[in-house]
Design a protein with these regions (language model features):
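A structured beta-alpha segment of the ubiquitous adenosine-cofactor-binding alpha/beta core
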Residues: 1-40
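Active-site-adjacent "lid/gating" segments in soluble enzymes
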Residues: 37-182, 186-187, 193-201
């Protein structure tokens, strides 16, 4: 079943503007999916990659995720409680920050592609995000004012799901999510057709 799956992947890539991966550097190379090989086949492709430790250094090939990087970078020590038990930033802050930075980098790469026609690769690492956060000056926490989180409900095959509403609210844009709680393996390997805001609601 490998070749039909690979042919399907290549067909999807031929129509893609952006591919986003979250694997260790070089881990996809053996499948012919390195940035160099992808750009040889699809010169205009923008590739966004998130890794734990970055592209170089002794830990580059190691697996990792937000909590591990917080521990290794010293964040867990800084946020330890009075007993010395390691702490953590709220809401997997490295993952979220890296995601926002990657999205900004991809948008910049798409703009550059529009100007020069070339594909680009954008790399973000959780370790670098941690380094940048730790380099910021310390501030005294202030008491946050109460904030009511806007939520949306959706019916799914597994029941009703309540989740945070989209972070950005654009007049006339969607105010909910197109897909919530879809069972794994039920989607066809094809790009979704764009829908108007009125249909998305």
């Amino acid at each position: 079943g490998y070749k039909p799956n690979r042919d399907c992947l290549e067909q999807l890539l031929s129509d893609a503007d952006v591919i986003v991966t979250g694997y260790r550097p070089n881990s996809l190379d053996r499948f012919g999916l390195s940035p160099v090989e992808l750009h040889n086949r699809y010169p205009g492709l923008v590739i966004g990659r998130v890794s734990a430790w970055g592209l170089s250094g002794p830990w580059a090939e190691r697996r990792g995720f937000d909590s591990i990087v917080q521990a290794a970078s010293g964040i867990a020590h800084i946020h330890a409680d009075g007993t010395g038990r390691p702490g953590a930033l709220p809401a997997q802050a490295l993952d979220h920050s890296a995601g926002y930075l990657l999205a900004a980098g991809i948008m910049s790469a798409l703009r550059r592609r529009h100007l020069d026609g070339h594909g680009w690769t954008v790399d973000i690492s959780l370790a670098r995000v941690a380094q940048e956060l730790l380099a910021q000056p310390l501030s005294v926490p202030t008491e946050a004012s109460p904030y009511k989180i806007q939520t949306v409900n959706a019916r799914t095959p597994g029941g009703t799901v309540t989740c945070a509403a989209p972070a950005i609210n654009i007049s006339g844009g969607p105010d909910s999510y197109r897909w919530i709680g879809r069972p794994w393996g039920t989607d066809q390997p094809e790009w979704a057709e764009p829908q108007s805001a009125s249909v998305q609601r």
